[in-house]
Amino acid sequence: MLDHPLNSLGFAKPPSATRVVVAMSGGVDSSVVAAELAADGYDVVGVTLQLYDHGAALAKKGACCAGRDIHDARRVAETMGFPHYVLDYENTFREAVIDEFADAYLAGATPVPCIRCNERVKFKDLLQTAKDLDADCMATGHYIQRKMGAAGPELHCAADAARDQSYFLFSTTREQLDYLRFPLGHLASKAETRALAARHGLPVADKPDSQDICFVPNGNYAAVIEKLRPGAADPGEIVDLAGNVLGAHRGVIHYTIGQRRGLGIGGLGDPLFVVRLDPERRQVIVGPREALSTRIVPVREINWLGDAPLTSQAEWQVMAKVRSTRAPREAVIRPISDTEAEVELIAPEDGVSPGQACVFHVPGDSRILGGGWIWRGR
């Protein structure tokens, strides 16, 4: 008997015999993934994670994971005729994401909780749940591509650079990548996604995209931290690089590296920027723009996705992205261990902040080689 040709998810069996768990946030992206797979005849199981207390504080436009999102995901499942489950992951989410978020700000870092959520909740616990449900794979609505290479599946940027989410998925491991599918990664624009939603008659076709961190109402992260860590907003001094006191601040957690506005120290001549935070002394250190310039970026907790081990070479020529909103820049990785390295930026970058990710791209290619966490800069 001839082998069955590979289906669109890469399995040698018909779609009807291929079970796929779809991580459904209630937004248009994951809804389209579920609808397309269901329409193609796959055995789809929708799963939505309840990650936070979905009270009035979060029942608003622009936040994911809110109460209405669970309702919307369920409506999509009903429209397309596949089962849908809601799993309570609030305790896991608090321990794996929210607590570290608060502690990072207290340590003077600027965290990216969405990366930790993907790494520690969605692509860990939810992925295991998918396996427990005997699913062949798990699909998400992320804009990123999974391509087969000579050494196995590779992570690649989305076809639509404006929607690319590779920065937030750098910590996806090889084992996870083997099990995951990203059906939207090849689309040229978000308009295509919404057109597919309309074609399937999905109730979320015109739903606004999520913008905020799901557990931070109205973007007021400082209020969340103060609630979690009383005393976190204790006031202190704003000082210059020489230690001269220029003013007072309302809590280190209100400031980020590179910040210029809202310092309350105008009239001092040249513009001043936050160049460092010292939580132990409760000081915000400011200086001229050139003081923000960083070339050497120590990176740890590296997830390396190259074909050869990270330490197999003394140097790697890459393109490095140090913030989600910035373009990758030429850089050299000098490994210290399998999970730690020094990254030299060929051209200095302003505002490199501890707590952000440094993501590695193959020069001239869409492939992602992984990345790590910035823990200090010089």
UniProtKB/Swiss-Prot annotation:
Organism whose genome encodes this protein:
Cereibacter sphaeroides (strain ATCC 17025 / ATH 2.4.3) (Rhodobacter sphaeroides)
Taken from the UniProt record, the cysteine pairs bridged by disulfide bonds within this chain are: 117-214
**Class of enzymatic activity (EC top level):** transferase
Q: What is this protein called?
A: tRNA-specific 2-thiouridylase MnmA
- Provide this UniProt record's keywords sorted from A to Z: ATP-binding, Cytoplasm, Disulfide bond, Nucleotide-binding, RNA-binding, Transferase, tRNA processing, tRNA-binding
Q: Where does ATP bind?
A: 23-30, 49, 141
Q: Where is this region: Interaction with tRNA?
A: 163-165
The protein's site described by Interaction with tRNA is found at 142, 356
Q: One of this protein's GO BP terms?
A: tRNA wobble position uridine thiolation
- GO CC aspect terms: cytoplasm
InterPro entries to which the protein is assigned, alphabetical:
MnmA-like, MnmA-like_C, MnmA-like_central, MnmA-like_central_sf, Rossmann-like_a/b/a_fold
**GO terms for molecular function, please?**
ATP binding; tRNA binding; tRNA-uridine 2-sulfurtransferase activity
Catalysed reaction, written as an equation? S-sulfanyl-L-cysteinyl-[protein] + uridine(34) in tRNA + AH2 + ATP = 2-thiouridine(34) in tRNA + L-cysteinyl-[protein] + A + AMP + diphosphate + H(+)
| Protein family (similarity comment) | Belongs to the MnmA/TRMU family.
Classification via CDD domains: MnmA_TRMU-like
Q: Where in the cell is it found?
A: Cytoplasm
Main subcellular location of this protein, as a coarse class? cytoplasm
Q: What is its EC number?
A: 2.8.1.13
Which residues catalyse the reaction?
117, 214
User: What domain of life is recorded for the organism?
Assistant: Bacteria
Q: Which gene holds the coding sequence for this protein? A: mnmA
Q: What does this protein do?
A: Catalyzes the 2-thiolation of uridine at the wobble position (U34) of tRNA, leading to the formation of s(2)U34.
